[in-house]
């Protein structure tokens, strides 16, 4: 049942337009161009750290799939690309393999191939309110020898899904237990509706080490569930429900000291630069890599290399030699993102005057 649902999700994403109609919010963010960047583009360094591990670029292959025979090849190609490029990779929900050990190999193949990459295991937080505990979390981690455990928070999807689990009571308590008991860091991950500052603060207090905002602007799982069963009309109504990615980054970065993963509608290097300048640590990409991963790891690598080059150009044009420099560059927040910041009491003006270098001549 669970494995067939996973295949449904992949097929719908590939065959139907399930992208959000609401944008991720990066169109409201303007990086201030520097006509004299005072850097050599060839010297720009994309390396950074994520949860203590050095990676070659602030780009993550975000959680997509696993748990069905027909998607094993996708995970293989994603793993090859992650290993070659030294970037993190998150697997899809491992619940199917926890409940049916015959499906474990669709996940274990990832570590067999990506022996040095940063890997994130993945389970739904709602399962821990239904009986899962430390043992299941450890199984997921050990299955891929994971560097971290992502707990996905998907109340919207569960509410729309015909088989959905909607008892989210005591989930925060379960997150706290896992954060205290596991030897690897816990990442709280939304799946397309974003995370607000209130939840971000609570998650930090519960002990998570990173938040994946999973904002509005990319794939809509309400849309995916709508196409799975059109008799459930709510999917269409809630297609664009949630917090746009740029806004969610702003909320989480401003009110916590956690590492922020930006996912949800990120499609190019300029958006990556904007997300990092807003406070993200790394940016996750999923849907654009899905079709490519069905064909070959080379297509996945080509797409990620394109993103890296675009990010380098954006960094060059704002005078940033290192990823850390992006967090000091000037950016202007306009439009609905600015309106949101005002309504929520976030100081959006401070981002406009963070110039990396004051060039003194003579």
What are these regions (language model features)?
Residues 1-51, 55, 335-338, 342-361:
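An N-cap/entry alpha-helix motif that binds or orients negatively charged groups
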Residues 42-51, 75-80, 103-111, 136-140:
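Short, charged beta->alpha transition segments
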Residues 72-73, 101, 131, 161-165, ...:
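Short, solvent-exposed loop/turn segments at secondary-structure boundaries
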Residues 79-80, 84, 113-119, 126-262, ...:
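Alpha/beta enzyme core
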Residues 86-125:
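A gly/proline- and charged-residue-enriched helix-loop-helix capping module
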Residues 133-134, 138, 312-349:
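C-terminal domain-closing interface element
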Residues 254, 270-273, 277-325:
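Shared catalytic-loop signature of beta/alpha-barrel
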